[in-house]
């Protein structure tokens, strides 16, 4: 508590500091008695007054005013002891508490602000796994999603995957209201929690590609190590930005922020299980897709220090409202459908991996029937973008897909050209080989018999004609192949004559 003295009347009171029951009280705060309706009304009016001046309002430690926690802290049930020892003598039954505090305070605030200043965005800091409650029940516009930071940091991957699934089954729109972050002024810096290597960037990539609002902490991009509290007026450490860290943000993260329109909505968001070759779900892999404005994206992140590989195919259950808003149906889709790809064996999909800028090709029918196969290193991620479909009219794309066998290339167009030139390359290798050059240019091979020489010349003749045939097929041009072959044979004979003269 702190001592308050009225300098005019001399009246003295001892007032509690704010407290969440987990550590020392907040000595820059005074705790109000929210059991009094006039207090709740006064605070609500103050919020509305602020809303007339600012479009966004953030409520610090908002969860401490939720009914169940306010009761736990300040008016505990008889026999429970309470989290603030001196409040035990102020215990109160549930009935008494509900009579004095009948409606959730934040529900009243949201409703009254909506009526008075409807364009105001209300953002709540709510921990203790109350994020969903603040959005679903209290109607808060945005809520800090501390579960993202804590669970990804601790690699509680199965729990966080289930958290996302639960939201999708209840109401997918809630995902849009989460503020995802990797640190805040009350926590250690992002780099103390996630490092500065692959785990940090994998988590950061998730943060900026999930629906909701990504939030960067002060100094996060620069790699500052000093923890900044809300009370800090200046930095106390002499730190400089980490240039390599900044460059990697510019290369991997910032381009994704320019595509928030692709990631922020939930109507086309789908979440997947990552199925390993032995048929098990790898709970350490976060896999999801989204699409908007004709663009599509697939994101995968392996939040574990181990390699993995597997398939993504069927999405998790997702609530879909019907024409009757009171009813919802649970739906799922396979990845080809989620990306709105043609289910046709004659179509192929080409896409680019943002992490390495390589391009890949997959058959549409295979994507629909089998899903997408992906390999991931420890703490590695893939973000597949720039999807486009092509029709395979003359089997050139099927040949390319078979040739690449899942591998990525810098440019599909160049790889396609290289694939089309494969017959020409193979024919040329049969001509320009080691045996020919040894025969023509190494003196020890001048002792070949006449029959041996004739066989080599005939082989060159045959292979050269095949080579010219392939060139003609590729260019669709006719030429005097017989003349070219005769010219080559003439050159070979000339070379042989020169060799014989040298020998002589």
Task: Label the model's feature ranges.
Residues 1-259, 265, 341, 361, ...:
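Alpha-amylase-like alpha-glycosidases and glucanotransferases acting on alpha-linked glucans and related
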Residues 160-166, 266-293, 353-369:
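Flexible, glycine/threonine-enriched loop-and-boundary segments that flank and lead into catalytic domains
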Residues 228, 307-314, 391-394:
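Cytochrome P450 core scaffold surrounding the K-helix E-X-X-R motif
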Residues 251-253, 331-341, 401-434:
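Active-site-adjacent segment of 2-oxoglutarate/Fe(II) JmjC oxygenases
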Residues 277-338, 385:
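Carbohydrate-binding surface patches
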Residues 297, 367-399:
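C-terminal beta-strand-rich structural cap/linker in extracellular carbohydrate-active enzymes
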Residues 326-368:
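Trp/Gly-enriched beta-strand surface patches
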Residues 387, 412-504:
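Terminal accessory regions of large proteins
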């Amino acid at each position: 508590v702190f001592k308050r003295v009225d300098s005019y009347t001399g009246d003295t009171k001892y007032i509690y500091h704010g407290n969440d029951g987990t550590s020392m009280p907040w000595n820059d705060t005074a705790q109000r008695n929210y059991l009094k309706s006039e207090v709740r009304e006064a605070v609500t009016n103050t919020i509305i007054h602020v809303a007339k001046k600012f479009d966004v309002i953030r409520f610090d430690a908002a969860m401490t005013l939720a009914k169940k926690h306010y009761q736990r802290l300040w008016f505990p049930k008889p026999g429970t002891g309470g989290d603030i020892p001196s409040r035990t003598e102020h215990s109160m039954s549930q009935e008494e508490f509900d009579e004095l505090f009948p409606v959730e305070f934040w529900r009243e605030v949201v409703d009254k602000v909506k009526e008075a200043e409807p364009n105001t965005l209300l953002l709540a800091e709510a921990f203790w796994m109350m994020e969903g409650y603040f959005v679903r029940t209290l109607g808060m516009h945005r809520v800090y999603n501390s579960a993202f930071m804590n669970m990804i940091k601790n690699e509680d991957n199965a729990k966080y995957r289930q958290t996302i699934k639960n939201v999708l089954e209840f109401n997918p729109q809630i995902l849009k209201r989460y503020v995802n972050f990797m640190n805040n002024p009350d926590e250690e810096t992002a780099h103390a929690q996630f490092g500065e290597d692959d785990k940090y960037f994998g988590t950061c990539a998730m943060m900026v590609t999930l629906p909701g609002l990504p939030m960067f902490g002060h100094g996060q991009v620069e790699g500052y190590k000093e923890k900044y509290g809300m009370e800090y007026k200046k930095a106390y450490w002499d730190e400089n930005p980490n240039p390599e860290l900044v460059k990697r943000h510019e290369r991997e993260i910032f381009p994704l922020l320019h595509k928030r329109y692709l990631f922020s909505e939930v109507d086309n968001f789908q979440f997947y299980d990552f199925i390993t070759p032995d048929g098990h779900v790898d709970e350490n892999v976060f896999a999801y897709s989204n699409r908007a404005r004709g663009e599509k994206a697939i994101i995968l992140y392996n939040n574990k220090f181990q390699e993995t590989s597997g398939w993504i195919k069927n999405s998790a259950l997702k609530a879909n409202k019907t024409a009757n808003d009171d009813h919802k149906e649970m739906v799922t889709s396979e990845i080809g459908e989620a990306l709105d790809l043609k289910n046709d064996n004659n179509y192929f999909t080409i896409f680019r991996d943002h992490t390495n800028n390589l391009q890949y090709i997959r058959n549409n029918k295979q994507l629909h029937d089998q899903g997408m196969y992906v390999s991931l290193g420890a703490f590695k991620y893939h973000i597949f973008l720039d999807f486009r479909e092509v029709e395979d009219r003359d089997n050139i794309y099927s040949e390319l897909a078979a040739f690449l066998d899942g591998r990525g290339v810098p440019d599909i167009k160049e790889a396609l050209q290289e694939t089309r030139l494969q017959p020409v390359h193979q024919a040329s290798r049969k001509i320009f080989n080691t045996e020919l050059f040894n025969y023509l240019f190494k003196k020890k091979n001048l002792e070949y018999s006449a029959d041996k020489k004739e066989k080599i010349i005939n082989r060159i003749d045959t292979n050269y004609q095949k080579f010219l045939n392939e060139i003609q097929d590729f260019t669709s041009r006719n030429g005097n192949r017989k003349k070219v072959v005769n010219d080559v044979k003439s050159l070979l004979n000339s070379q042989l004559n020169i060799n014989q003269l040298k020998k002589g």
